[in-house]
Amino acid sequence: MIWKVENLMERSPFLSSKEIICSADLLARALKFKKPNVVVANAGSELPMKAAFEATVADLITPIFVGDIIKINNEAHKLNWDISSFEAISADGEENSAKIAAELCGFGHGDILMKGDLHSDVFMKATLTKDSGLRTGRRLVHSFLITHPSDKRPILISDAAVNIKPSLVTRKEATRFAVEIFHALGHERPKVAFLSATETPISTMESSLDAVTLSKWATAEIQDADFSGPLALDLILSSESARVKGLSKDRVAGNADAIIVPDIVSGNAIFKSLVYLAGGCAAGIVNGAKVPILLTSRSDPAAARIASIALATILTNR
């Protein structure tokens, strides 16, 4: 099964005119596992309900709805979906919906926490409180796993949504999570690149110096993966650029599976370029809590939400 979503963006010569197509591979892998209980915070709007509906029809999840019951039922009615057999918990407002949803997952009632129609800061604040039961001691790090219909090989970007200016410690955690994600997907030895604007360390470019530090640390501390940095984006993506610039022997250059970025601006720009310009499909997930957290954008198509659910399901069973 391939999930297609019409691209309704206003046309520009630089925007992809192709439909967004999410890879069926994640869904096929996820369907091998027991269906998780997915708690949808503030569920009563079109896109989160459509994603929950399609994931339920695909036999991927058991949904638990939190939010305005009238709105939830109205959206279900629009989909001709009988949700009477599923749990729906009444909650007024974004903050209360986020709090209840987080606690359901923190105390074992839900396996995956999914953001519905509410602001990201409100949603994440609820997950960070001690009362939520979600904290594990690990840092919360976001990853986008992006696929393209012309290439079966995904690429991961971290962090493009949560950590604005991540410290070295946070980027080390992001590196660990990136490797864990690819191992869960069956990739025995992923290749991880540390992004900068150059392949040569420059004293006035902090990201290049950090990339050296991170590459040395990861090579020494993390098994079953290859690391390289600093690498500019062309050297991360293009084997021809790697050849021309004398890095053809670098195991990561031109063939990276994951990109660890120095800040949210660069990560977000790359992620949105791959989605809006290249027509990629992004599965987004926050790791580091007791359960996977799906921090999807309110404008994300249902197909991207389903891809995120599938990725989270795989990770809960790793």
Please report, for each region that a protein language model flagged, where it lies by residue.
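Anion-binding alpha/beta catalytic cores of soluble intermediary-metabolism enzymes, centered on
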Residues: 2-252, 257-318
